[in-house]
């Protein structure tokens, strides 16, 4: 019984050693691929964006519709960069300043689920910074298209 356990332990140690070596080789290959990718990316010039980068939003209610249209348009033409709701919300947050930036801090501090839900985040912004219901109906069609 003890001999069998010793043999089993020896086999496990040999397997562990082989897997460790294989893991090291794979990590080295990954490192080389990451370096090659970085080198290739430096050689490629990204196409110019037909939509200008959105302006920041400081919480001024009258600018909210403009901000939402600008950001939605920018994300639409750069959809490969904004592949999920969390990326879209993070992009919006990166453009907040002043009162709007202060407003979002508690959501970030408590890791609110709203940070992963683009539609809910927009609704919360509209509620906080004011939104005319007539404009909401028109702009909602644009956002749904996105």
Curated annotation (Swiss-Prot):
Ubiquitously expressed with high levels in brain ant thyroid and low expression in placenta, liver and leukocytes. Expressed as well in six of the seven human breast cancer cell lines examined. The keyword Iron-sulfur does not apply. Induction: Down-regulated by muramyl-dipeptide and lipopolysaccharide. The keyword Phosphoprotein does not apply. GO terms for cellular component: nucleolus; nucleoplasm; nucleus. It holds the Pfam family DUF4939. Keywords: Nucleus. GO terms for biological process: cellular response to lipopolysaccharide; cellular response to muramyl dipeptide; maternal placenta development; maternal process involved in parturition; negative regulation of cell population proliferation. It is found in: Nucleus. May have an important role in the development and/or progression of some cancers. Interacts with NOD2. Belongs to the LDOC1 family. This is Protein LDOC1. The gene is LDOC1.
């Amino acid at each position: 019984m003890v001999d069998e356990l010793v043999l089993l332990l020896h086999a496990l140690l040999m397997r562990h050693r082989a897997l460790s070596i294989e893991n090291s080789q794979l990590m080295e290959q990954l490192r080389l691929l990451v370096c090659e990718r970085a080198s290739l990316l430096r050689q490629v010039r990204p196409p110019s964006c037909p939509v200008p980068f959105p302006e920041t939003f400081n919480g001024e209610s009258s600018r909210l519709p403009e901000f939402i249209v600008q950001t939605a348009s920018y994300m639409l033409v750069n959809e490969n960069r904004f592949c999920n709701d969390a990326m879209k919300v993070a992009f919006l947050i990166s453009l907040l300043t002043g009162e709007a930036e202060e407003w979002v801090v508690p959501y970030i501090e408590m890791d609110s689920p709203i940070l992963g839900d683009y539609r809910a985040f927009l609704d919360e912004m509209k509620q906080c910074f004011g939104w005319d219901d007539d404009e909401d109906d028109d702009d909602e069609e644009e956002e749904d298209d996105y």
